């Protein structure tokens, strides 16, 4: 595995570059913009290691981040747009700015990205921009998405009971096997088609 030494390339712009089996663990990548970069080696089926890296305000656009290790990163303000991130591990990632021990806010923009089989277990992504992503088989046990925009998403093989999705925008999403009897949907936004479909699963016919 190739390691960065010294582990700092913050506030840089990197385009159309390839990083196979690279170790960015602990690196300061804050404010760095990656466009059209490859971080996944298809031959070895391995992604890059970003664990414990500072990715505050970092931007990934049109990148392949499949199987990347994002555990325990500082990800406040991160942008991941139009990327492939299948199988990536975000456990322990912090998207929070702690103001006091009881007051915080989250900031993240993960949009138009394939998050199939990624691991977001126990991650807090409240009031974030998370729209038009693919969530097939994504691990979300104990995750909190409360108040986030999850609209336009694809949620096949998604365990709705495992995560907090209260007050989320789910309009225009494919909701997979969502059963409203076992999920707290307080404050959730649904469009009329979704609402009628969910009620039909309970044997309730919606007229008009």
Feature annotation, model-predicted:
Residues 1-208:
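Tandem repeat scaffolds
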């Amino acid at each position: 595995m190739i390691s960065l030494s010294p582990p700092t390339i913050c506030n840089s712009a990197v385009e159309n570059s390839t990083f196979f089996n690279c170790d960015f663990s602990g690196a300061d990548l804050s404010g760095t913009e990656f466009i059209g970069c490859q971080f996944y080696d298809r031959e070895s089926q391995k992604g890059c290691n970003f664990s414990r890296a500072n990715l505050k305000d970092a931007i990934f656009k049109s990148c392949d981040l499949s199987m990347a290790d994002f555990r325990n990163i500082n990800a406040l303000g991160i942008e991941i747009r139009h990327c492939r991130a299948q199988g990536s591990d975000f456990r322990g990632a912090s998207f929070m700015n702690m103001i006091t021990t009881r007051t915080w806010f989250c900031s993240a923009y993960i949009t138009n990205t394939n998050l199939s089989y990624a691991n977001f277990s126990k991650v807090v992504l409240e009031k974030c921009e998370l729209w038009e992503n693919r969530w097939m088989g994504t691990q979300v046990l104990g995750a909190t998405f409360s108040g986030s925009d999850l609209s336009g998403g694809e949620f096949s093989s998604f365990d709705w009971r495992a995560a907090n999705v209260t007050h989320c925008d789910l309009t225009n999403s494919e909701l997979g096997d969502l059963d409203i009897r076992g999920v707290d949907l307080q404050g959730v936004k649904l469009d009329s088609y979704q609402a009628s479909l969910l009620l039909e699963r309970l044997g309730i016919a919606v007229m008009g």
